[in-house]
Amino acid sequence: MEHPKKPKLFLKTLIVLTCHLGGEGENSTLLLAQHGFSEGVLNKIPHICYRNCNTITSNKAINTYINLNNVSFDMSDYFSQIKLHKLPLTLMIPIEASRGCNWGRCKFCFLNKGYKFRTKSVKSVKNEILNYIEKFNCTSIFFLDNNIVANDNIRFDTLLDELINVRQKYNDFSIKTAEVTTKGLTFELIKKMSLANFESVQIGYESPSNTILKSIKKNNTFASNLFFIKWALQFGINLSGINILRNLLEEDDDGIKEGINNLFYMRFILSSKKFHHNISFLSVSTSSRYFKFLESNKLLDNWSSNTSSLLSEKIINKKDKYILFEDYTKKTYNKLWDIFKNVETYYIENEYKYKFIKNHNIITYREFLNNELINELEFKENEEHWCILTISNKKIVSINNLLSSIKNSNMKIIEQAICELEAEGLIYVNDTKTEILSIVDTDRILY
């Protein structure tokens, strides 16, 4: 359990409860269901806290983690009840291809406490899906994983191939939603996600500022997020839960201003009306890495919980509320976020488009705002500017990658070309020039 006092507090506060199970829960729940409150059994159940006469007892028995390859959801009763009562429901079956978090370093997150990271074999995932389809005639699934990629692109590639095979066998097969980490995802993998019929994906976005993402130790970068968004939308994959967390302790004016400036590189995406940010508030509790800092600096009074406010301090004292409830937020925020929202709204409400026209070895770039030409540039097919755009179209590259890929050039010329393309808003470049990507699709050329 994420906080040792939490189970006892639940039982102390809610007298109608008999016991509390923590951790992953399957083994504990099964043992409790099989043996109930039999004498001599409770002390063998992992992560249980229970009432013992007038005292509350916690058991520290070591939990054994189940092998995911041996586990699938028994949906028989669920589907039989739907059929019996003729319920008009849109049916989706949950699939667990992995459990826990393979990263575990994000400073703001406390959602995976008590979980051990491991994966289910690709073969088991495929067989489970096929079994559900054949048994229940349900071809819509969704993945429960925190990150279906699971930090293993080779495994993910194999999984996508198997999902594509399922799609070829059952034409109406669809993956309604899944969550991925964008770092390292290639154009080819995103394309395969479309072929497998991923309808919607969440990417763990958190911030439009690369500096803030780095400071909170996210695995994603702004470049990896932007690259995935660019191609996912072009392949018809919707994006959900593009959440920005306000009031991160690492947040400052410069980070928010960086996020505002980065909206310029998202203008075509925002203008498509297929993408927008959801601005929310950071939540903290005693499970959060931030809690000790807030407590030691006497800042907790600035954070409040809608849930805990419903309970009188006669029932639970103020300090214990931070243990029980995980929705403590700070309602005030940096007003630069209002500017961010206004700028984003501008890009959403105005139509940005572009086109490339090729004539011999000259490519003309034209950019339009509400159908009015606002920028026109010419590139020679073999010059540095066009080479940079094409090389960084379907992959994120570094300046050293560009230097080795562009013939008869040098670092000074490439640096100048990068600077000019960035100023025009045609490429995004991080501060170390290790992540460069084209925000336009250079394959969209009119001849």
Predicted stretch roles:
Residues 379-447:
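Long, charge-rich, low-complexity alpha-helical segments
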Residues 4, 119, 395-396:
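Residue at a beta-strand N-cap/secondary-structure junction
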Residues 1-63, 422:
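Glycine-rich beta-alpha loop elements in corrinoid/cobalamin-binding modules
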Residues 323-397:
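Hydrophobic, secondary-structure "cap" segments at the distal end of domains
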Residues 10-11, 132, 193, 232, ...:
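Generic structural signal for hydrophobic
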Residues 69, 73-236, 246-249:
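Radical SAM [4Fe-4S] cluster-binding motif and immediate context
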Residues 51-95, 364-365, 370-378, 421, ...:
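N-terminal [4Fe-4S]-dependent radical SAM core
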Residues 17, 119, 166-171, 181-353:
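A structural motif corresponding to the C-terminal lobe/cap of the Radical SAM core domain
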